[in-house]
């Protein structure tokens, strides 16, 4: 996330906070700013909390915020992994391998390279 995205998300949160505050004011206006002695303060608080949670669950912006936050948790290959894979795909031994390998297979540029399997048996055969 860059700073512009974070700033826009902060603005969305601020507007949501203002709407929540207005909803609280509406609820308080419906029930009266101070509950009378006969009403139970706990039930009024429970109603306010349930109304607020309902509003917050129905708000589409919360889904967007959750999606944005979950994008950070997505598995993304890091540059370190790319460099490791690049190193593994390159040949690990680059020194000219003279006098080894099979020229016919392209593993040596030396025409006098060792051949495998050997065409001549070593003397004495089999070795002791």
Curated annotation (Swiss-Prot):
Keywords: Coiled coil, Disulfide bond, Host cell junction, Virion
Pfam families associated with the record: Cauli_DNA-bind
Location of this chain's protein in the cell: Virion; Host cell junction, Host plasmodesma
Recorded GO CC terms: host cell plasmodesma; virion component
Gene Ontology MF terms: DNA binding
Compositionally biased region (Pro residues): 119-128
Region Capsid binding, residue ranges: 122-128
Chain residue ranges for the region called Disordered: 98-128
Coiled coil (UniProt feature): 1-30, 37-58
Subunit structure and binding partners: Homotetramer, through coiled-coil domain. Homotrimer when interacts with icosehadral capsid. Interacts with capsid protein, and with Movement protein.
Family stated for the protein in its record: Belongs to the caulimovirus ORF III family.
Function: Plays a role in virus cell-to-cell and plant-to-plant transmission. Interacts with virion icosahedral capsid and movement protein, thereby facilitating virion cell-to-cell transmission through plasmodesmata opened by viral movement protein. Also interacts with aphid transmission factor, attaching the virion to aphid stylet when the animal feeds on an virus infected plant. Aphid saliva may later detach the virion, inducing release of infectious particles when the animal feeds on a new plant.
Protein name: Virion-associated protein
């Amino acid at each position: 996330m860059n700073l512009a995205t974070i700033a826009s998300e902060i603005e969305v949160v601020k507007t949501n906070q203002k709407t929540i505050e207005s909803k609280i004011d509406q609820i308080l206006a419906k029930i009266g700013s101070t509950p009378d002695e006969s009403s139970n303060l706990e039930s009024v608080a429970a109603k306010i909390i349930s109304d607020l949670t309902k509003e917050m669950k129905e708000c589409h912006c919360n889904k967007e915020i959750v999606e944005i936050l979950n994008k950070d948790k997505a598995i993304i290959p890091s540059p370190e992994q790319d460099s490791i894979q690049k190193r593994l795909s390159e040949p690990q031994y680059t020194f000219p391998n003279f006098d080894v390998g099979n020229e016919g297979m392209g593993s040596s540029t030396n025409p006098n390279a060792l051949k495998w399997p050997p065409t001549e048996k070593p003397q004495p055969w089999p070795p002791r």
